[in-house]
C-alpha cells in the first residue's frame, strides 16, 4: 500500500478556469468529470478536488504525471451515495494498479485529497 496527499488553493483553480475555460479542464479532467463538476453549486471546488485527488494518486504511485501516467489515466466519479470512486482508464495502468481509493474534501479556500493505492508486484521484486 502506498499513500499520497495533495492540497490545492481554490483561487488558483478559479483563475486558471476563468482565463482558459474548457481548455484548462480538458487538460486533466475526463468528460464525465467535467460534467460532474460543472453541475455543482461551486464548480471550482469540485474541479480543485479532482485535481488534488489525481495529484495524490500519482504521488502514491511515485511516478508523477509522465510516460504511462497521464491526467486522464484516472477518472474519479461519485457513486450513488456521493463517495468518490477511482476508475483506472489508462490501459497501461490497469496491469499495475490493484486498487485505488481517494477521499476528497474542500472548504471555501482549498481542496485536499488523500489517496491509498495498492500496486501489483513487479516481476522479480520481493
Swiss-Prot record:
**Principal location class:** cytoplasm
Keywords assigned by UniProt, alphabetized: Cytoplasm, Fatty acid biosynthesis, Fatty acid metabolism, Lipid biosynthesis, Lipid metabolism, Magnesium, Metal-binding, Transferase
Q: What GO molecular function annotations does the UniProt record carry, in alphabetical order?
A: holo-[acyl-carrier-protein] synthase activity; magnesium ion binding
The record ties this protein, via Pfam families, to: ACPS
Names of the cofactor(s) = Mg(2+)
Q: Which InterPro entries match?
A: 4-PPantetheinyl_Trfase_dom (IPR008278), 4-PPantetheinyl_Trfase_dom_sf (IPR037143), ACPS (IPR002582), Ppantetheine-prot_Trfase_dom (IPR004568)
Which superkingdom? Bacteria
The record's subcellular location field reads:
Cytoplasm
From the UniProt record, list the reaction(s) this protein catalyses. apo-[ACP] + CoA = holo-[ACP] + adenosine 3',5'-bisphosphate + H(+)
Report whether rRNA processing shows up as a keyword of the record.
no
Assigned protein family? Belongs to the P-Pant transferase superfamily. AcpS family.
Do you know which HAMAP family this protein is assigned to? AcpS (MF_00101)
The task this protein performs is described as:
Transfers the 4'-phosphopantetheine moiety from coenzyme A to a Ser of acyl-carrier-protein.
The protein depicted here goes by the name: Holo-[acyl-carrier-protein] synthase
Record organism: Chlorobium limicola (strain DSM 245 / NBRC 103803 / 6330)
Tell me the classification of the organism that encodes this protein. Answer: Bacteria, Pseudomonadati, Chlorobiota, Chlorobiia, Chlorobiales
